[in-house]
Amino acid sequence: LHGLGADGRDFVPIAQELDLSGVGPVRFVFPNAPEMPVTINGGYVMPAWYDILGADLTSREDERGLRASQAAIEALLEREKARGIPASRIVLAGFSQGCAVALMTGLRHAQGLAGIVGLSGYLPLAALTPAERHGANATTPVFLAHGRQDDVVPIMGAMASHAALQALGHAVEWHDYAMGHSVCEEEIGDLNQWLLRVLATD
């Protein structure tokens, strides 16, 4: 799931750098967020999974928008399962806003996923997560990664999300890198190794 103002094609170059041949055929799905006015950008209409109401991403959250995107990604997961892909072979991943939606949706999904990936983002509606998360994903592996110089989504928010997930008993692999709000080669390598582990069939 892509970030604010981007589209699904943003993830294509990253997917092309991953070598997952060791776990058999892998298919990537790159959905696009709807276009909507974004408050923090002066109401400018752009692709967004939800509205950003202010610089403090968690003090005022667009719960309606978040839940609408959760429903859209749930529908996408159901379509994939209807194609014959079991939930246990699906990894839900996102960057920035996409990270927030991936974490929110994955933790609440009613069937156990192979894993959840959150890059340069945070856990939204964190106070509601303990009551709303589904037991089916209580032990689902989570990969979180963030840039130490990120001035768009500060790393402190990601660290708080990491701590919250650990407190709930989730198996979280955490990485941070000397970069801003972006993705780096080392991160892709770490993600590759993690994906090989969570998708291993033996």
Name the predicted role of every residue range.
Residues 18-24, 84, 109-112, 166-170, ...:
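Short helix-capping segments at alpha-helix termini
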Residues 1-91:
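Serine-hydrolase catalytic machinery in alpha/beta-hydrolase-like enzymes
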Residues 31-35, 121, 179:
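Active-site loop/turn elements of alpha/beta-hydrolase fold enzymes
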Residues 156-202:
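C-terminal catalytic histidine-bearing segment of alpha/beta-hydrolase fold enzymes
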Residues 81, 86-137:
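Primarily recognizes the serine-hydrolase "nucleophile elbow" in alpha/beta-hydrolase
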Residues 11-16, 130, 154-164:
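Short alpha-helix in the alpha/beta-hydrolase fold that links the catalytic acid
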Residues 137-142, 168-171:
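Short, proline-enriched alpha-helix->beta-strand connector loops that line the catalytic pocket
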Residues 143-146, 150:
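Short beta-strand/loop motif that positions the catalytic acidic residue
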